[in-house]
Structures are given as C-alpha cells and as structure tokens.
Amino acid sequence: MLKFRLYDKELDIDLNEWSKKDYSKYQNDVHKFALFNETISQIYNSYIANPDQMGSIFDKVIVVELDSLKIAVIVVNYFIDEKDNKKVLGINPILVNPKLINKGYGQRIIKYLIDIKGKIFDMLPAKIYAGIDVNNIRCKHLFEKLGFKLVRQTDDNDFLYYELEINE
C-alpha cells in the first residue's frame, strides 16, 4: 500500500541522488520537467523560505513510499480556487524515482490520490489540479488517461493545467 509522509531534509537526504546526472537514463527528463535543475532539498528549502508565494492553505513536499521504498516525491498545494471558491489539491511536480520511471508508479500514485479523493492531512478538496510542462508528453497522456481535463495554458504556452472534479 502507498504511504504519504512529509519530506524530512535529514531523513530524505538520499533523494538528492535522484538529481545526479548518472542516476538513471531518464535524468534529462527529470531535470527538465520536475526538478528544474535543483535538488529536492533545494526545492524544499525554497518552499520554507518563501511561504508568501505558496498556496493559500498550505504547501508540502511529500515522500511517497511503497513497502518502505521511496518511489516518488510530490509537491502538493492546497488552495482555494478564486473562480468557484472550491478547495483544490494542486500537484506540481510529481517526481518518480528515476530508476522506476515507466513502470506504472506515477499512474498508481495519481490513481491512489483519486481513490482517496485527494484527502491528504485531513484536507478534502473538491478537485485535483496539475501543472504540466507542455513538452512532457508522458505526463500529459497520464493525466488525460485518468480523466483530467485541460482547463488552461499559460500565456507563454510553457505549461498546461489539468483538473479533475472529485468531490462535489
């Protein structure tokens, strides 16, 4: 069974290995689409240092484990959608362990989030929202396959935003 827990910068220092260029054959994609050339520790530190730039409810860096194996890291944001005043679980990015890419773990994690209706840390959102790099074909396909609908694209056409209503 999947387990979500908060990232711990001391306990999870090994996750920085995922950003090393020789860690896996998918490293270029990992850097381009998920890490933006930063380590997981740097992403975490950025969230801690800039709370005013984050979600309106909270932002967390989550480690996903399966049988004690760290399989992914997700940055989640809970916020209120100003259009309809609904609670939203935002996912951006989801980073599957590069050695486990293309083995179904990303799909399993997103399906699990849908199954639990996005409820993490006692928050129950009305929808799940995902920001995806326009060139990340695999990720776009995954979210579309799981029923997410494209709701907007950034003005610079770099990112797509997908949404799935889960709790009315």
Language model segments and positions:
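Extreme N-terminal starter segment of soluble prokaryotic enzymes
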Residues: 1-3
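Acetyl-CoA-dependent GNAT
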Residues: 5-99, 116
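Solvent-exposed beta-strand sheet faces enriched in polar/charged residues
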Residues: 77, 129-131, 151
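Short acidic/glycine-enriched loop/turn segments that link adjacent beta-strands
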Residues: 85, 136, 156-160
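Conserved acetyl-CoA-binding loop-helix of GNAT-fold acetyltransferases
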Residues: 96, 102-117, 141, 145
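Conserved GNAT acetyl-CoA-binding A-motif
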Residues: 119-132
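Conserved active-site alpha-helix within GNAT-family acetyltransferase domains
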Residues: 133-152
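C-terminal "cap" of GNAT-fold acetyltransferases
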Residues: 151-168
